[in-house]
Structure formats: structure tokens, C-alpha cells
Amino acid sequence: IIIATIKSWNIENAKILQKQHLGIHEIKIIDNKEEFVLEKIKSFQPDIIFIPHWSYIIPKEIYENYKCVVFHMTDLPFGRGGSPLQNLIVRGYKETKISAIKVTKEIDAGPIYLKECLDLSGSAEDIFKRASDVIFSKMIPKFLLEDIVPCEQDGDIVSFKRRTPAESELKEEMDMETISDYIR
């Protein structure tokens, strides 16, 4: 098993998972882009690669040769694309689902293995940490215990664009709740 992530809260949870599965599963943690290359992946020969938070394009030669599962913070096919948390908050959502999907050529369009609910209250960091806890305590363990068959995404596709700093500028006409959502 490989876990590829760049966020500290995911790295911490991956290390906990490593300890919990010592002697059961060999888990390698990759926390930088330079290590996430085919040659290094080949040397480890993983059965599955989990990608809980990765800000880079996943190389085609990796997802075509290995089972790669990415975790996306929307109820797909709603919310494909960049800045999912920020886009949900700006649209007033109070909860979402984390979708575990098969990595394919098209971003966030792969078949869905499973989904879990996620509360969007608190700061962005609180939400990311809560998402990490859901991924590592509920979702990844299901993969390790069951043979989950993914299903094609069903429903209307709604795509998000990566938000820019200019889109997060405060405006005079905003009410307090909107301002709170912009700065959390």
C-alpha cells in the first residue's frame, strides 16, 4: 500500500495507520512529488495507492499500472475540479460527502468506490483534519477489509474552478455570515 499526500494531518494519520497494520500490510508514505514517479512506485509494487490530498497531476503511467484511489471533498459528480472546500463554503453548503474514486485521465471523473459524509463547520483547517480522520478511520479500512467495486458516476455534472485570491476578496455589501465563510 502506498499513501501519497502532502498535508501534515494526512501524514500523521497515515503513520497511525502504518502502526495499526504493522505485520498485516506494508504501508509506504510518499509526501513529495519527486518520490511519486513510476520507477519508485515499481520498486515498492503496491496493490493499491491511496491519494488523500495531492495538488499535482497524477502521472498516467502510474494510474494505468496501479489501482489508484483519490479522495475528493464533494458528492461527485457534483463539484468536480479545483478548490472543492472553498467552492462549497462560498455556495453556502454546511455538509458534503467525501468521494473515493478511481483515478482516470479526466480529473475527478472516475468511477466511485464509496462515499462518506463530512460536516463543513469550523475553520478550513478543522474541516481538512476532519476529512482526514474520515478517510483514515472509515474509508481506507473498508478498502483493506472488502473488495469494493466502483460504480460509474451518476447524475448531473457540476464542475468547480480553482478559486483565485481575487475571488476571495471581501466586499462591502457582504453580510457577517458570508464574511465568516470567506475568511475561515
Give residue spans per PLM region.
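One-carbon transfer enzymes
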Residues: 1-184
